Design a protein with these regions (language model features):
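N-terminal secretory/membrane-targeting segments
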Residues: 1-3, 20, 171-172, 181
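Short, structured active-site-proximal loop/turn typified by the sulfatase FGly-forming signature C/S-X-P-X-R
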Residues: 18-64, 112
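A conditional alpha-helix N-cap/helix-loop micro-motif detector
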Residues: 20, 93-94, 172-173, 216-219
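Extracytoplasmic/secreted envelope proteins and their assembly/folding machinery
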Residues: 24-27, 176, 220
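His/Asp/Glu-rich, glycine-adjacent segments
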Residues: 59-206
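Glycine-/proline-rich flexible loop or hinge segments
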Residues: 10-12, 36-38, 48-51, 76-89
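Beta-strand elements within well-structured catalytic alpha/beta cores of enzymes
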Residues: 2-16, 29-31, 55, 104, ...
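Charged helix-capping and loop-helix junction motifs
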Residues: 23, 207-213
Length: 224
């Protein structure tokens, strides 16, 4: 393969963000040469985990099986308990159709993913999945089971062991550093990286405002 493909998802980025980003240094370099698709027709439900699974399968949720971020269930002991369910769709084996990175590996290419939803427990390619412990779980044991063999020993001590699990901003920025290391050292033909920072900011502060603008500036730095 003469070229490598890097897919970076800036979660919650909207069309009306583009004029703001166009005035920032790094987006200003690429947007004039970019193919911009406006008024994208979304899947239903428009939630992070179903959307990102559709992106790497090409099929809607009713086919790939990821119908929500969370698995339906009632477990009141879990601090993330809600009517939607306590547990999230963390694990790759819940996807019911082949994915793009799996197909790349089977075609003799090298794939990798960093914080891409629904990739925990993946063994076919390098995966550093988004997953966090509940109050009863040991983070070290959970991550060892969820990450690709070898990835835990490589990244735990330098990154995950320092996470403050109640502060998702830690995961956002460590994730970028891990993705850069994977890109430079592993040289995958396909790299998937999910950047959740803007989505978390909008959940916390609303759709617009100073905090959202500051987050867009941070995305420009990440892009650079």
């Amino acid at each position: 393969m003469a070229h490598r493909l890097v897919v970076v998802s800036f979660d919650s980025l909207q069309e009306n963000d583009l004029p703001v980003l166009a005035a920032m240094p790094n987006f200003a370099r690429i947007l004039p040469k970019a193919a911009v698709v406006r008024r994208v027709r979304p899947i239903y439900p428009t939630l992070t985990y179903p959307i990102h699974t559709t992106l790497i399968t090409g099929v809607p949720p009713k086919q790939h099986g990821i119908l929500h971020n969370q698995i339906p269930g009632l477990e009141r002991e879990n601090p993330d308990w809600s009517l939607y369910g306590s547990d999230w769709y963390w694990y790759a084996d819940t996807v019911q159709v082949p994915t793009l990175p799996q197909q790349a590996q089977q075609a003799g290419r090298k794939a990798a993913s960093v914080l891409w939803p629904v990739t925990a427990g993946q063994v076919e390619y390098l995966s550093v999945p988004p997953i966090w412990p509940d109050k009863r779980q040991d983070p070290q044991q959970l991550l060892r089971q969820a990450m690709t063999p070898g990835a835990f020993d490589r990244f735990w001590a330098r990154y995950h062991s320092h996470y403050k699990w109640h502060n998702v901003d830690d995961m956002h920025f460590y994730g970028v550093e891990i993705a850069l290391e994977v890109l430079e050292q592993d040289k995958p033909d396909l790299l998937l990286h999910h950047v959740e920072h803007l989505d978390s900011t909008r959940h916390r502060y609303g759709d617009s405002g100073r905090d959202v603008y500051d987050c867009l500036r941070q995305l420009d730095i990440i892009l650079g």
